[in-house]
């Protein structure tokens, strides 16, 4: 579908609310024997999802790839003993600080460690990347992101969000994300609105370019 193509993934599931989607997705992806490794300054939806996890979790210093690797070493040692899977979670663009996550560097760690990477790109979708496809597109590492979350509440100016991944993962999430199974889906009017906004983004980068023009003007004015 259009969203999957836009973020360069195989399939996509629409979600009724972004916060609930991230929390519920984390819950669905891991069980109590699995290990989570996550950035210390992750959004509340990630932190709450991690807190619900009944297994081991290791936190790394914000955007510190060296510390992330240290935690991966700990996680992999435990995984070897228990057969656990490892899920690494970070953000594409951190909303509270305004800095990009070290997504490309974390993807590179896959050459040494066996883990899946979940990226919350709520602030990157529509604003970063040559075509607005997000932080992974901006950093040239979209293929290395296993589970990609984007929201409709920022650049789309709507409600809801989506999760994109391999078709097998998305199919699993459709039947295991409790926030989607036991709640109403997005109203069709909002879905149509999101598709229209996506059409505008795909047709022209002018809205994104205008955003960065205004952002850079503000930064220059504040510095001066």
For every predicted segment, state its role.
Residues 1-17:
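Conserved N-terminal alpha-helix of the aminotransferase class I/II PLP-enzyme fold
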Residues 25-44:
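Conserved PLP-anchoring active-site segment centered on the Schiff-base-forming lysine
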Residues 159-160, 177-186:
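A short glycine-threonine-serine/GTX helix/turn-capping micro-motif
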Residues 101, 192-224:
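Conserved PLP-dependent catalytic core of the aminotransferase class-I/II
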Residues 137-172:
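Active-site PLP attachment segment
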Residues 58, 62-119:
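Active-site phosphate-binding strand-loop segment of PLP-dependent enzymes
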Residues 32, 52-54, 144:
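Short, structured coil segments at secondary-structure junctions
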